[in-house]
């Protein structure tokens, strides 16, 4: 992988990770446009660490407050005594569905699910769901109104992000809106909920990628991750400002347009569903089945 590829993919990752348009879809499509090989789910998961760092720094005050409240509540035997403590628990509980689904269904969400047909379908279907939710939601509740049911349900929405093209931010934002949360509150919770799953996925895939016989250079990983961090910070700030005064309709239109364009290109033979995708084999086991996994979108 060249440095130009690393920069472009890092930029794509950072800008699309937090927008409800699917980072995996764009990381899969971008190489097709430039004639590059698919970087793979492992590389995508590793440079997600850059966007995780962006969330940690952007929301550092909120995160410190949540962590402090969590342990203070345990020490005082009042684990759910404050809003911050409850939100910390909601994030932990909300991470369980994607973890369980990822481990249980990993054989079904490996390389085959990176097909451009799957991605185009996910882009369109989830866009239509977001449209319906946007129109019917009350947009009145805040994070202070969240209950255990809300944390679990949004966590289940996050599990849908295992399907490439669904978009982790898109599914969790849709889940939050469906429960009546204000757009900005739904987005803030989506960002906080992303931290455990994407961190664990990135660390796991980094270990796997470093052990693989064929892998990007360390420089490509560093550059991609740093660019993802910088562009991710910008994307977070922009999205929160945007959702204070606007709806998610622009993302719905974009997703449908991109999904339809992909289908047209696939049907006309301009694109191949699995072109450029390479499997990563287990080190020391020639011919072993691929272990590349899509953890979160």
UniProtKB/Swiss-Prot annotation:
GO CC terms of this entry: plasma membrane
Major location category of this protein: membrane
Keywords of this entry: Antibiotic resistance, Cell inner membrane, Cell membrane, Cell shape, Cell wall biogenesis/degradation, Hydrolase, Membrane, Peptidoglycan synthesis, Transmembrane, Transmembrane helix
Catalysed reaction equations from the record: di-trans,octa-cis-undecaprenyl diphosphate + H2O = di-trans,octa-cis-undecaprenyl phosphate + phosphate + H(+)
UniProt membrane topology term: Multi-pass membrane protein
GO biological process: cell wall organization; peptidoglycan biosynthetic process; regulation of cell shape; response to antibiotic
Residues annotated as signal peptide: none
One Pfam family from the record: BacA
Annotated compartments: Cell inner membrane
GO terms, molecular function: undecaprenyl-diphosphatase activity
EC annotation from Swiss-Prot or TrEMBL: 3.6.1.27
Transmembrane segments: 39-59, 85-105, 113-133, 151-171, 190-210, 220-240, 249-269
Domain of life: Bacteria
NCBIfam families on file: PRK00281.2-1, PRK00281.2-4, PRK00281.2-5, undec_PP_bacA
Similarity field: Belongs to the UppP family.
UniProt cross-references to PANTHER family, sorted A to Z: UNDECAPRENYL-DIPHOSPHATASE
Other known facts: Bacitracin is thought to be involved in the inhibition of peptidoglycan synthesis by sequestering undecaprenyl diphosphate, thereby reducing the pool of lipid carrier available.
Function (record text): Catalyzes the dephosphorylation of undecaprenyl diphosphate (UPP). Confers resistance to bacitracin.
Protein name: Undecaprenyl-diphosphatase
Naturally occurring in which organism (per UniProt): Myxococcus xanthus (strain DK1622)
Gene: uppP
């Amino acid at each position: 992988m060249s440095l130009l590829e690393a920069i472009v993919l890092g930029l794509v990752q950072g800008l699309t990770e937090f927008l409800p348009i699917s980072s995996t879809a764009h990381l899969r499509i971008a190489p097709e446009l430039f004639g590059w090989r698919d970087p793979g789910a492992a590389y995508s998961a590793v440079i997600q660490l850059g966007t995780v760092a962006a969330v940690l720094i952007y929301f550092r005050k909120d995160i410190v407050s949540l962590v402090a409240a969590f342990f203070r509540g345990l020490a005082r035997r009042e684990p759910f005594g404050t809003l911050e403590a409850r939100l910390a628990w909601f994030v932990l509980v909300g991470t369980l569905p994607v973890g369980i689904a990822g481990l249980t269904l990993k054989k079904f969400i490996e390389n085959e699910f990176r097909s451009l047909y799957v991605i185009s379908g996910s882009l369109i279907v989830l866009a239509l769901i977001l449209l319906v939710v946007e129109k019917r939601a009350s947009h009145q509740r805040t994070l202070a109104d969240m209950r255990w049911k809300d944390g679990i349900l949004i966590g289940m929405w996050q599990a849908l992000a295992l399907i490439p093209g669904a978009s982790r931010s898109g599914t969790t934002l849709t889940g939050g809106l469906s429960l009546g949360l204000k757009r900005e509150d739904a987005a803030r919770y989506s960002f906080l909920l992303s931290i455990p799953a994407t961190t664990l996925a990135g660390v796991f895939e980094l270990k796997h990628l470093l052990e693989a016989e064929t892998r990007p250079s360390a420089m490509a990983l560093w550059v991609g991750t740093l660019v993802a961090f910088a562009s991710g910070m910008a994307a977070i700030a922009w999205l929160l400002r945007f959702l204070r005064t606007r709806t998610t309709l622009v993302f719905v239109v974009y997703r449908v347009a991109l999904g339809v364009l992909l289908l047209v290109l696939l049907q006309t033979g301009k694109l191949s569903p699995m072109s450029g995708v390479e499997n990563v084999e287990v080190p020391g086991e020639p011919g072993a089945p691929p272990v590349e996994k899509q953890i979160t979108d």
